[in-house]
Curated annotation (Swiss-Prot):
Lipid bilayer topology: Multi-pass membrane protein
Subcellular location(s) per record: Endoplasmic reticulum membrane
One Gene Ontology biological process: dolichol-linked oligosaccharide biosynthetic process
PROSITE patterns: S5A_REDUCTASE (PS50244)
Membrane-side (Cytoplasmic) residue stretches: 1-12, 101-122, 180-195, 288-319
Alphabetic keyword roster: Endoplasmic reticulum, Lipid metabolism, Membrane, NADP, Oxidoreductase, Transmembrane, Transmembrane helix
Pfam families for this protein: Steroid_dh
Described purpose of this protein according to its UniProt entry: Plays a key role in early steps of protein N-linked glycosylation by being involved in the conversion of polyprenol into dolichol. Acts as a polyprenal reductase that mediates the reduction of polyprenal into dolichal in a NADP-dependent mechanism. Dolichols are required for the synthesis of dolichol-linked monosaccharides and the oligosaccharide precursor used for N-glycosylation. Also able to convert testosterone (T) into 5-alpha-dihydrotestosterone (DHT).
Catalytic activity, reaction form: a di-trans,poly-cis-dolichal + NADP(+) = a di-trans,poly-cis-polyprenal + NADPH + H(+); a 3-oxo-5alpha-steroid + NADP(+) = a 3-oxo-Delta(4)-steroid + NADPH + H(+); androst-4-ene-3,17-dione + NADPH + H(+) = 5alpha-androstan-3,17-dione + NADP(+); 17beta-hydroxy-5alpha-androstan-3-one + NADP(+) = testosterone + NADPH + H(+)
Keyword check for Acetylation: no
A GO molecular function held by the record: polyprenol reductase activity
Identification of the protein by name: Polyprenal reductase
Family: Belongs to the steroid 5-alpha reductase family. Polyprenal reductase subfamily.
Species this protein is from: Xenopus laevis
């Protein structure tokens, strides 16, 4: 607890962690856009390029052979969503038992949240429905992405860095703490399901609508990418890359990344736009997906001479 006491008033350790993550990805994005650390310039630049790339954007990259020791198959992406499904499902189960049956939160979990969230904004009373919905949307998103990784996506032999893999696992654990930390956990009386539903507001409907819309488009885009490697009968015929077309691909190179941002924005809306720390999560998603989209956009332009020049990388008409 001494570490928390050293933090500025009103700032939690959790907020500082997200700020540090945001700063790291902003630095990486700006450094890449300024071409300040091209691969091969130095050993440090080679490591930098290896850390920011994954999958197809690593192909053709000049890499020291020893960096391949840290390669993990990209098809292991499903591990992230499995961890999120189990962990955040567990936290949602604890939250529902607290709210509906007054079952106390385990002491170890209270201690962790106290350590991470001490000094943060006051927890919002009457916002339990927002927290339940946020957890539910995150859990459903993890379930859908897990099923897509296992049954829709067709992975090539692309790789991710071991650091990226570890970060991805930790990310979904930290997300759970971030959502749960927004709800008061010291309540002594249960609420009924009707009480929760009475908290419903316009922003819950708006957030759910945005979530469904973005999720449908993301699923469609993942199906389009998978179909590029299938025959008309559905058989896998190659693992090559091709120019995707249809749906939001007509506007941007990486619409599935744009949809990911909208999904996290929808959860911010479900919180009534009031969860400050969640906005730091949204900022991370914006920066990380922007970096990945720029790398992917450049890959398409370098590989395909006839690639549509009107497409943006990430956000339609903007970036």
């Amino acid at each position: 607890m001494q570490l928390v006491q050293l933090l500025p008033p009103g700032v939690s350790l959790l907020a500082l962690v997200w700020l540090a993550v945001d700063a790291a990805f902003l630095t990486a994005l700006l450094l890449y856009l300024q071409r300040g650390c091209d691969s091969g310039r130095s050993l440090l630049c080679s490591v930098f390029q290896d850390l920011i790339r994954y999958g197809k954007t690593k192909s053709g990259l000049r890499r020291p052979s020893w960096l391949q020791w840290f390669d993990i198959p990209k098809r292991c992406f499903w591990h992230f969503y499995f961890v999120s499904l189990v962990w955040n499902g567990f936290l949602l189960w604890i939250l529902l038992h607290l709210l509906l049956q007054s079952v106390p939160v385990p002491e170890w979990l209270q201690a962790v949240l106290q350590f991470l969230c001490a000094g943060s904004e006051p927890q919002v009373l009457g916002g339990e429905l927002s927290v339940v919905l946020a957890f539910s949307l995150l859990w459903l998103h993890s379930l859908r992405r897990l099923l897509e990784c296992l049954f829709v996506s067709i992975f090539s032999n692309g790789v991710i860095h071991f650091v990226q893999y570890c970060f991805g696992l930790g990310y979904y654990i930290l997300i759970g703490f971030t959502i749960l930390g927004y709800c008061p956990l010291d309540r002594r009386t249960a609420v009924s399901l009707d009480d929760l539903l009475m908290q419903g507001n316009w922003y819950h409907i708006l957030g759910l609508t945005l979530y469904v819309w973005a999720s449908l488009h993301q699923y469609t885009c993942h199906c389009i990418l998978a179909d590029l490697r299938k025959s008309a009968s559905g058989a896998i015929i190659n693992l090559k890359h091709a120019v995707p077309t249809g749906d939001w691909f007509e506007k941007v190179s990486c619409p599935h990344y744009f949809a990911e941002l909208l999904i996290y924005l929808s959860i911010a809306v479900v919180f009534g736009l009031l969860n400050t720390i969640w906005w730091l999560v949204v900022l991370y998603v914006l920066l990380s997906q922007a970096l990945a989209a720029v790398l992917c956009h450049e890959f398409y332009h370098e590989k395909f001479d006839s690639y549509p020049i009107h497409r943006k990388a990430f956000i339609p008409l903007i970036f």
